[in-house]
């Protein structure tokens, strides 16, 4: 059994370098919600050095709110913006001797694409247009996964160690109670349950089926790094290989 561990990089966190020693995939911010050409280059170099799979992390053009505010953009605009961001990171990755493997949308773009078919289709279409070999990462069971499969892309279904789930398998919005799991034991138990048994307990108590192919780790701060180390160790202890 294997599991991919992914983390978002190039978003201004001081812990990026250490996080790259723990994860198997890196999602690199492409300049819209965070990052710039130089942070993208630095992140790619570190990922190549650590043998970590490189992916683009496109977001809404919303630096002020870190890409976490809902935006109602036409699908053709989202398509063009996604192409633009993937293309920029692909060029930098190529120049640094790496290979871009996947695309994972950021923040509210990710959340809206999980539920809005037109937005999901625009993103999947852009990924396919850039390179049909790219893997599309999205919330397990979401519209984005459906759209990726529709375009013939390989998809990777993502679960979250530190986020609460609703009964329909969607994440509890950050604005609501129960959105973030701050207890390390609870996060660890939830993640192992999702990976080993394919289910998650919602905040209302129901067990919801979920397919876990990659686990998102948030790496900001020493506490997050300590949890990342502990989670990786827990997988290895159970014979679960960590690899992209």
Curated annotation (Swiss-Prot):
Record's keyword annotation contains Secreted: no
EC numbers on record: 3.5.2.9
Main EC class the enzyme belongs to: hydrolase
Coiled-coil boundaries: none
Record field: catalytic activity: 5-oxo-L-proline + ATP + 2 H2O = L-glutamate + ADP + phosphate + H(+)
Keyword Ribosomal protein (UniProt): no
Keyword field: ATP-binding, Hydrolase, Nucleotide-binding
One GO MF term attached to the UniProt entry: ATP binding
Pfam families, per database record: LamB_YcsF (PF03746)
Assembly behavior: Forms a complex composed of PxpA, PxpB and PxpC.
Function: Catalyzes the cleavage of 5-oxoproline to form L-glutamate coupled to the hydrolysis of ATP to ADP and inorganic phosphate.
Protein name: 5-oxoprolinase subunit A
Organism: Escherichia fergusonii (strain ATCC 35469 / DSM 13698 / CCUG 18766 / IAM 14443 / JCM 21226 / LMG 7866 / NBRC 102419 / NCTC 12128 / CDC 0568-73)
Lineage: Bacteria, Pseudomonadati, Pseudomonadota, Gammaproteobacteria, Enterobacterales
Chain's gene name: pxpA
